[in-house]
């Protein structure tokens, strides 16, 4: 969290307690969450935080390429080299993603090392993820014996340093600890350091003391900038806890060490403040309520006449949630406003500060999947600007080597014209140049937050629909990613992120245009309704089509070969679907039938563009057909070949009755409908043939005689 310089310096003076309690909300306003894999419906771990500073503060998402012997320099105290932290790493850094400040905000645009400022969240090519930092605090007793160090490492460089050098989460913990041992800490923070096997919460406790604890699979955690959330841990078990050498001996030697009843050092109560302020306390109560593990008024906390939580009783870093979270619930946790309890609901009480507030600059959640290789185990979900009215974008950030520049301008070239410390509706109504997604969601948030009564509900509902579509389709893309050979995964990661960015931008840009038109019209008598939102059915009128870019149609019923008589009907058909989790994508499939020519090549048949095709049967012979099925995204699947064989139709003589045929040897018409007589065929010279002939002659003579008699009678 970007903390104003005056506030950081106040942490080192005697006015700390009074200042923090009276400090304006932006000074301490980040919230960190952790959900162990046994407390989720997916079996995945979720961890991350939101970064709070001001309503219209520019952040950029991008990829830092490796650097030889990188220099880490801080302008946190002043834009003069040497006044802050500076360190040169000997070696080549790892590639990593970042969510970085515009260096112009720090007068660092002309200093290559210092320009990599406040990178906050990312994953490196080794699969190590960092979310940094959650600003915390220390108490006056600790300040007196181990004050913070101006030239120590602080939030300005923490994420860049860790992502540049860490080969694993534990390696990151150890390397950061060594830096603090040597250079000290510029501020008090908690930092998430995770990989595909473990997640650590690293705490900068004071000038030179630190501790890192490994998070369990059965717990959750919410921390809104509170240094004193307690966590009992065996300090001698290095599989669960790493720490500075003097983390116990220093406070013990000065008689400020706090212990549990059994004598175990209570590190966080020893170092943290007793009360971090009502804004922090209220957000902790909101977070616990969100996860179904609500704190009890009077028992666990007290409130003032405005409903703000003024103090916490025995607050803990971890707890057992009352619900199991899915991906959507994990993402939305950083937008919580106390909706689960009217007494904590910031939508009902403007005096309450909320986790989901109008000063968030970006939010990140890392979804970590056990059992997968480090290159694809972690999905970084990133929401630009305030996440209350935003959509998180997923990326395989360990693999990512590029981002679409239209949507994510480089951190050192982005136009900062549209930003500001205060929210500005007039600025949000101005159409911006380019397609910067940060500015699109910044303006959406400004308009929705400041017109909550008429716009907030339907905008949030519509964005939730889009978010759920992205989540469902990410599962589809993930199946493809896991099946993709390792050497081809980076290409898919880059294309997938570009595709989801484009799809979300198109939806968000259209939404913003409609919101601006609504506000400019000045008529709020009816609630704003996004044109793409089907409120009755709780869906969008046209879906996000992220996974569609990678899922070809699946042919479920192949065309079958047919044999028929000349002139008869020969019908071919195909059935197909698109397994992309997109409603209505099957209805957008198109078809084209082809016939094989004498040269062996297939050519398209004019007008044969349906799932069924009736082949021509005017000529005797065989022809081979196939069909191409194309998705709305242009991906094609080709069917098996099917052969239509046309045979010569049976020839009937004039006057011949149905069911009769002519005996080739005797020219005698026989009734084939009657049952054949048992025995051999008649042969020339057989008595049966003579008998038949005589009977025939006799019959003819009899008829002629009858005719003559009839004539005479006349």
Predicted regions and their residues:
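A contiguous strand-loop segment
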Residues: 30-154, 175-304, 309-318
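A short beta-strand segment in extracellular, disulfide-stabilized domains
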Residues: 568-578
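Surface-exposed, flexible coil segments in extracellular/virion-facing regions
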Residues: 595-616
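C-terminal membrane-anchoring or membrane-association module
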Residues: 698-714
